[in-house]
Amino acid sequence: MAATEDERPTGSGEGERLDFLRDRHVRFFQRCLQVLPERYSSLETSRLTIAFFALSGLDMLDSLDVVNKDDIIEWIYSLQVLPTEDRSNLNRCGFRGSSYLGIPFNPSKNPGTAHPYDSGHIAMTYTGLSCLVILGDDLSRVNKEACLAGLRALQLEDGSFCAVPEGSENDMRFVYCASCICYMLNNWSGMDMKKAINYIRRSMSYDNGLAQGAGLESHGGSTFCGIASLCLMGKLEEVFSEKELNRIKRWCIMRQQNGYHGRPNKPVDTCYSFWVGATLKLLKIFQYTNFEKNRNYILSTQDRLVGGFAKWPDSHPDALHAYFGICGLSLMEESGICKVHPALNVSTRTSERLRDLHQSWKTKDSKQCSENVHIST
């Protein structure tokens, strides 16, 4: 009898081909949606991001059928910060990370409840919208106007974004979140695009990578966030010249050892196989990297017992590295994994569903506009 996927022997040597244990990763993501280790308790206010890693991971593995989509959709909508009846909290709207405030369960079917400490978080709005699209929702209960108003309130004068209205760190991560939100809602009125573009451009460092902000150290994660944001805006080649793009390409391609690191002289880490790999894909030079070494590194961090991936070999797996490890393998067209949309960070199937959704909105708006013209005449 042939060995099953989980029983096949494998080696860890550089020259041996390691197995991708798909079924174990499916079970790992299932557990992330059901019960989490105690060490995750500090992430309670960011629970929606963990849900994103698990749901998008299952989507990448074509295994969303193992979850109750309707229940999760209702839970996500219950995290939407809606306008109150007097609309006094528009600048605080979006999605919160979990039900930590104890506000009554409301899956976006009634007006919002006023609470002095309740507000959306830019990363939770990004992951919340992503999860809804991944699960096949049509976003009909998303208050788009309020989400965009809340997003506009988070942009600072230098073009960057903070996470919450009370103020927080402001850097390239949140510029990317804002770009994804506008792209998914098909409405760029949520930001001053010119200011955001200037912020990205000013973040280019002396060594040609992109930093979290002007004058800071280049980083693989912030380079992805900046380049992906410009791609979502459709502005990449307007912002950087061909010469500058070639320099960015060189900086990125120099990040590979076997896997990728995020900064010079730092250890290789599984997640950068996506952050840097996706940037190289967007810059159209990923094909010049060493796929075999990258694949072997990612799979060396795979937990063969419980599933998932860690940042380093012989470390504990976690939801973030499990997801980005799979996305990194997807860039190399690993068997059993769906294709990833490198800028939006979801499966291409989900990005195509989103495109169809945008088209349906456009058709609906055109029809409504025609009806209004007919009534007025």
Swiss-Prot record:
CDD domains: GGTase-I. Geranylgeranyl diphosphate binds at H219, G220, G221, R263, P264, N265, K266, Y272, S273, F274, W275. PANTHER family: GERANYLGERANYL TRANSFERASE TYPE BETA SUBUNIT (PTHR11774), GERANYLGERANYL TRANSFERASE TYPE-1 SUBUNIT BETA (PTHR11774:SF4). Its cofactor is Zn(2+); Mg(2+). Keywords: Magnesium, Metal-binding, Prenyltransferase, Repeat, Transferase, Zinc. Catalyzes the transfer of a geranyl-geranyl moiety from geranyl-geranyl pyrophosphate to a cysteine at the fourth position from the C-terminus of proteins having the C-terminal sequence Cys-aliphatic-aliphatic-X. Known substrates include RAC1, RAC2, RAP1A and RAP1B. It is an enzyme of class 2 (transferase). Belongs to the protein prenyltransferase subunit beta family. Binds 1 zinc ion per subunit. This is Geranylgeranyl transferase type-1 subunit beta. PFTB repeats lie at residues 144-186, 193-234, 245-284, 291-333. GO terms for cellular component: CAAX-protein geranylgeranyltransferase complex. It holds the Pfam family Prenyltrans. The keyword Magnesium applies. One of its GO terms (biological process) is protein geranylgeranylation. It catalyses: geranylgeranyl diphosphate + L-cysteinyl-[protein] = S-geranylgeranyl-L-cysteinyl-[protein] + diphosphate. Zn(2+) binds at D269, C271, H321. One of its GO terms (molecular function) is CAAX-protein geranylgeranyltransferase activity. The keyword Metal-binding applies. Heterodimer of FNTA and PGGT1B. PGGT1B mediates interaction with substrate peptides. Its EC number is 2.5.1.59. The lineage of its organism: Eukaryota, Metazoa, Chordata, Craniata, Vertebrata.
